[in-house]
């Protein structure tokens, strides 16, 4: 009996390989699109942290001190002063036109007030429509303001006879020694690519799995497919999805080797646990795709739901905004997305270097996704054997 089942699975798998090889859509979704996304997102952020972002200055004081502040601000890695504007209105207009991301405003009399210890005020404006650029330039401008204030205060203390140690102890009584964990380069490609790339692969698996089942109904070949499996829905799905599992796992292996072997992104646990996590993501995504088609039984609705679920995964996985800071309802709903659990495995293994056992809850969650098709197998079998496709 086992040989018979194995033969049926093999014949269905061979049939599926022929369908994949003769239909460009499969090749695009399974090979071309993932490879394009791998290269696109990693080369898009090839330099890591953005540098030399355009900023402007409004210097109404125009003294040696303020010019020194501007030169020092321009020396920051992320900031590049590209223009000096005569007024606040001109600088604001340039920022609204997208010519600059931020500008530094120094009012008239700043140096005189600083030397007289009258607390002059400088202003800096950042365009947070561009979150990354706005945040980085705001950080540079704020740092420069603090350094400028400290420099003036140090000069005043020196003039009053204070030593360097006394002046520094007064200006900075607590010295901060900061160390960035896991991504010390602040590389945005490390931050984003490790989740975006698996997320895109997951989305493509959702849609390919739904389409590959629905296409049987669309071409009215579902009974032929089920007949090759002796009307066993388990054998039919196993044989049909097995070639896709192999291809998608190869693609998952490729992005792991590409990210951690070629680009040398942090992978403190070694690549083998991440390959295992990639296999779990592939199987969980396929199982979820089967579940969606069995739940809705129509290609159009199942594909729409798969697309929606995949896109929302990027926001709710915790990659861009921490789940613990979300609404409690959203925190609970985050567990319904496979990418969330893959992200937790990535953080525990690749970034923190923990053994796989410490990510057991996420591993179990992905395995639970693999059980979803069992809830709709009977319904799916009935649909494939008796329902007629309606365009």
Q: What is the predicted role of each segment?
A:
Residues 1-16, 83, 168, 177, ...:
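Juxtamembrane loop-helix boundary motifs flanking transmembrane segments in multi-pass membrane proteins
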Residues 1-190, 383, 390-391:
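Extracytoplasmic/periplasmic domains immediately adjacent to an N-terminal transmembrane anchor
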Residues 25-29, 190-194, 198, 235, ...:
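Alpha-helical transmembrane segments of integral membrane proteins
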Residues 36-39, 179-259:
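Hydrophobic alpha-helical transmembrane segments of multi-pass membrane transport proteins
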Residues 62, 254-258, 266-391:
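Membrane-spanning alpha-helical segments of multipass transporters and channels
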Residues 65-69, 209, 221, 291, ...:
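Hydrophobic alpha-helical segments typical of transmembrane helices
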């Amino acid at each position: 009996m086992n040989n018979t089942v194995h033969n049926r699975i093999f014949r269905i798998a061979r049939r599926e390989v022929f369908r994949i090889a003769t239909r460009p859509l499969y090749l695009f979704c399974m090979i071309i699109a993932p490879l394009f996304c791998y290269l696109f997102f990693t080369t898009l952020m090839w330099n890591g942290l953005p540098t030399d972002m355009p900023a402007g200055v409004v210097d109404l004081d125009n003294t040696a001190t303020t010019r020194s502040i501007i030169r020092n601000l321009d020396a920051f890695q992320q900031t590049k002063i590209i223009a000096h504007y005569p007024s606040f209105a001109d600088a604001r207009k340039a920022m609204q036109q997208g010519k600059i991301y931020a500008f530094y405003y120094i009012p008239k009399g700043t140096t005189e007030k600083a030397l007289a210890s009258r607390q002059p005020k400088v202003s800096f404006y950042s365009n947070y429509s561009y979150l990354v650029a706005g945040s980085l330039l705001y950080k540079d401008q704020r740092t420069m303001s603090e350094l400028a204030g400290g420099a003036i205060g140090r000069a005043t203390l020196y003039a009053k006879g204070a030593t360097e140690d006394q002046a520094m102890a007064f200006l900075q009584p607590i010295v901060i020694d900061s160390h960035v964990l896991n991504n010390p380069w602040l590389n945005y490609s490390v931050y984003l690519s490790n989740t975006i790339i698996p997320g895109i692969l997951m989305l493509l698996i959702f849609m390919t799995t739904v389409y590959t089942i629905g296409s049987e109904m669309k071409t009215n070949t579902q009974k032929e497919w089920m007949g090759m499996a002796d009307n066993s829905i388990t054998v039919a799905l196993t044989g049909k999805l097995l070639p896709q599992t192999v291809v998608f796992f190869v693609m998952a292996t490729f992005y792991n080797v590409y990210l951690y072997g070629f680009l040398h992104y942090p992978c403190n646990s070694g690549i083998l646990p991440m390959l295992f996590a990639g296999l779990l993501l592939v199987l969980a995504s396929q199982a979820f795709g089967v579940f969606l088609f069995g739940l809705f039984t129509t290609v159009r609705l199942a594909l729409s739901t798969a697309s929606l679920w995949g896109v929302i995964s990027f926001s709710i996985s915790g990659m861009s905004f921490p789940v613990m800071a979300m609404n409690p309802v959203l925190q609970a709903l985050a567990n319904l997305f496979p990418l969330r659990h893959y992200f937790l495995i990535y953080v525990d293994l690749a970034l923190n270097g923990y053994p796989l056992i410490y990510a057991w809850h996420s591993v179990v969650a992905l395995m639970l996704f693999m059980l979803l098709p069992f809830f709709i197998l009977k319904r799916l079998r009935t649909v494939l054997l008796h329902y007629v496709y309606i365009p």
